[in-house]
């Protein structure tokens, strides 16, 4: 009986400890990542986060927030409802370079026909980043999607440009990081919760 009680006590301690650990923000490269957030009042959970590197430089930490966690790209891409990619800059990058990298990621993961169908949204994305000027170290760029609004670019709490309509466009953006040809394989693994 004493053995059973001590096992139950240990199990209780483990459950409480793991619950407390889940409630704490995660941290990557000094960037605190909340376990939950909201877009358009809809609750989202942190699916995963990772580091984007270019050559030997640490460029940004990206975090993916979704309605329901998943570990494979296809499931994440098929989810509907509000979602967020939160990017915290680790170095200064001019907006043209940042937008160019996003455009390259779109081209790498979509056919010419698919890109042609997304041209108005891609143009709006480029215009939004043109308003940003330079993304500075510590800036937080959120790509927020809500079905009734579309995709918004929010930099340090301020929307830039106009919203880009369509669930398909947000999924296209996600493919930059979790598609078949991701911008960074390690980042993809992190966003998938790996």
Describe the predicted segments one by one.
Residues 1-10:
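Bacterial N-terminal signal peptides that target proteins for export
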Residues 24-79:
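N-terminal secretory signal peptides
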Residues 70-148:
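Mid-length scaffold segments of soluble, non-membrane domains
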Residues 155-159:
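Short strand-turn-strand beta-turns centered on an Asx-Gly dipeptide
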Residues 162-187:
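Flexible glycine-rich active-site/ligand-binding loops centered on an Asp-His dyad
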Residues 193-194:
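Short, solvent-exposed mixed-charge patches
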């Amino acid at each position: 009986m004493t053995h059973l009680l001590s096992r139950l006590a240990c199990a209780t301690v483990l459950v409480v400890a793991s619950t407390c650990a889940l409630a704490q923000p995660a941290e990557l490269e000094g960037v605190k990542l909340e376990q939950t957030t909201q877009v358009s009042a809809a609750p989202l959970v942190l699916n995963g986060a990772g580091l984007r590197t270019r050559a030997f430089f640490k460029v940004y930490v990206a975090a993916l927030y979704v309605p329901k966690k998943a570990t494979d790209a296809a499931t994440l891409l098929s989810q509907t409802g509000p979602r967020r990619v939160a990017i915290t800059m680790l170095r200064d990058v001019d907006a043209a370079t940042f937008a160019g990298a996003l455009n390259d990621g779109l081209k790498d993961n979509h056919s010419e026909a698919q890109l042609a169908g997304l041209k108005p949204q891609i143009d709006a994305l480029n215009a939004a980043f043109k308003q940003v000027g330079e993304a500075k170290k510590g800036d937080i760029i959120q790509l927020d999607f809500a079905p009734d609004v579309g995709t918004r670019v929010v930099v340090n709490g301020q929307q830039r440009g106009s919203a880009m309509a369509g669930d398909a466009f947000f999924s296209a953006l996600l493919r930059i990081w979790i598609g078949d040809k991701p911008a960074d394989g390690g980042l993809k693994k992190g966003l998938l919760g790996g």
